[in-house]
Amino acid sequence: MITELHGIDIRENEPLKHYTYTKVGGPADFLAFPRNHYELSRIVAYANKENMPWLVLGNASNLIVRDGGIRGFVIMFDKLNAVHLNGYTLEAEAGANLIETTKIAKFHSLTGFEFACGIPGSIGGAVFMNAGAYGGEISHIFLSAKVLTPSGEIKTISARDMAFGYRHSAIQETGDIVISAKFALKPGNYDTISQEMNRLNHLRQLKQPLEFPSCGSVFKRPPGHFAGQLIMEANLKGHRIGGVEVSEKHTGFMINVADGTAKDYEDLIAYVIETVENHSGVRLEPEVRIIGENL
């Protein structure tokens, strides 16, 4: 127990596989769940003072944590999950569940968030990755974000400063961590919004292996191609390493079917990249983030 951080939910040597969508990941030295910005600031200030590394995991959806785990502090925003509406502006804390946030927008007949109705993860992770699907993405509705800098300062970043691109935002380079974000929505019709969300969720259920642990879409879309199509053409559908395999339902996904490890994921990703490049000449670029230490 760290005396200076008394009162904060901190768990020592906690296996991260219990918190990731892939169901893999070694232990965090310290896993912290701040309830508010004050507790978050205390954790970061302590870590910086002690020269301990720290990072935020978000909801750990489009992410693989290596089997050796993560040193220092891992911070999860599960308890920082409030969502507020001010007119047509929706503000959500970083730990707010993305899918649940789209439901709140729908309940208030606000349109703009429908594209994200089936994307797993948190608001903070969605901003970080500029998450998107079915022609929509976070940058289309983003107004601003309150972020925590690596030094512990809290500041506001505009949409322009975010420099959004395909599955990219400026904070991927700066190390700033989203605390909350504001989105500009528009008045809509509840039934129309609901029908569109039902349609998109039906498509997702038909095409994606939602019944298995996975890290979501593994690769970015290569220009002029679809990653899943290239993988299928290279005869990799169902290819398995250890407990992880290329999904037969959607070859752009890798699923944990038998107590797979992070090494299984990494080995399969590397094998798919090499095989697809040899077959088509196209080198796939991972969309999923891989962090932590090997065993």
From Swiss-Prot:
Cofactor: FAD
Record flagged with keyword Flavoprotein: yes
Domain of life of the source: Bacteria
GO cellular component labels: cytosol
FAD-binding PCMH-type domain span: 23-188
Gene Ontology biological process terms in this record: cell division; cell wall organization; peptidoglycan biosynthetic process; regulation of cell shape
Keyword Kinase among UniProt keywords: no
A Gene Ontology molecular function term of the record: FAD binding
Pathway: Cell wall biogenesis; peptidoglycan biosynthesis
Record-linked Pfam families: FAD_binding_4, MurB_C
Main location: cytoplasm
Annotated compartments: Cytoplasm
EC number(s) from the headed UniProt entry: 1.3.1.98
Gene3D superfamilies: 3.30.465.10, UDP-N-acetylenolpyruvoylglucosamine reductase, C-terminal domain (3.90.78.10), Uridine Diphospho-n-acetylenolpyruvylglucosamine Reductase, domain 2 (3.30.43.10)
Reactions mediated catalytically: UDP-N-acetyl-alpha-D-muramate + NADP(+) = UDP-N-acetyl-3-O-(1-carboxyvinyl)-alpha-D-glucosamine + NADPH + H(+)
Function: Cell wall formation.
Family assignment from sequence similarity: Belongs to the MurB family.
Protein name: UDP-N-acetylenolpyruvoylglucosamine reductase
Organism: Streptococcus pyogenes serotype M1
